[in-house]
């Protein structure tokens, strides 16, 4: 798949998103900051990536996901948990960054902060019904299928 990419910050020309391994699903996104950003516990910030994408094909979307190491080691996660980039969006990719940890975290310019994953999308059409065909599960949710 070819994805249109617009470079909004010249520093990104030498650090384009790339797959780390042949099996990687995500492309690393960097914090395109001019100076270090200090996030105290509980604080959030909207961090620019210096990049804009245009997926273009309504059969695909992009997801911005956290990097596991930052979340596990430092409590740095996405403020919106998952960022959904629709196929027709053309603005800069921004990363909602939340320090859910107990200590202050300093995010340095050009540090890898999140990852971008391209996923297929199916746009559903509704079929209005009065009742559903009975299933084994029914309306059970929130642990109704048991612990194991």
From Swiss-Prot:
Gene3D superfamilies: 2.70.40.10. Keywords: Hydrolase, Magnesium, Metal-binding, Nucleotide metabolism. It is an enzyme of class 3 (hydrolase). One of its GO terms (biological process) is dUTP catabolic process. Substrate binds at residues 67-69, 80, 84-86, 94. GO terms for molecular function: dUTP diphosphatase activity; magnesium ion binding. Its EC number is 3.6.1.23. Pathway: Pyrimidine metabolism; dUMP biosynthesis; dUMP from dCTP (dUTP route): step 2/2. It holds the Pfam family dUTPase. It comes from the Bacteria. It catalyses: dUTP + H2O = dUMP + diphosphate + H(+). Its cofactor is Mg(2+). SUPFAM superfamilies: dUTPase-like. This enzyme is involved in nucleotide metabolism: it produces dUMP, the immediate precursor of thymidine nucleotides and it decreases the intracellular concentration of dUTP so that uracil cannot be incorporated into DNA. PANTHER family: DEOXYURIDINE 5'-TRIPHOSPHATE NUCLEOTIDOHYDROLASE. Belongs to the dUTPase family. This is Deoxyuridine 5'-triphosphate nucleotidohydrolase. The lineage of its organism: Bacteria, Pseudomonadati, Pseudomonadota, Betaproteobacteria, Burkholderiales.
């Amino acid at each position: 798949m070819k994805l249109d990419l617009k470079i909004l910050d010249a520093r990104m020309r030498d650090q384009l998103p790339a797959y780390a391994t042949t099996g990687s699903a995500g492309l690393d996104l960097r914090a395109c900051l001019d100076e270090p950003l200090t996030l105290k516990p509980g604080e959030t910030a909207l961090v620019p990536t210096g990049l804009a994408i245009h997926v273009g094909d309504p059969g695909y979307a992009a997801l911005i996901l956290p990097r596991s190491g930052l979340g596990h080691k430092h409590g740095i996660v996405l403020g919106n948990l998952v960022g959904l980039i629709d196929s027709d969006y053309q603005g800069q990719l921004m990363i909602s960054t939340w320090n859910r940890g107990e200590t202050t975290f300093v995010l340095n310019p050009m540090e890898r902060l999140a990852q971008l994953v391209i996923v297929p999308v199916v746009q559903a059409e509704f079929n209005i019904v009065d009742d559903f065909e009975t299933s084994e599960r029914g309306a059970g949710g929130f642990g109704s299928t048991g612990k194991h």
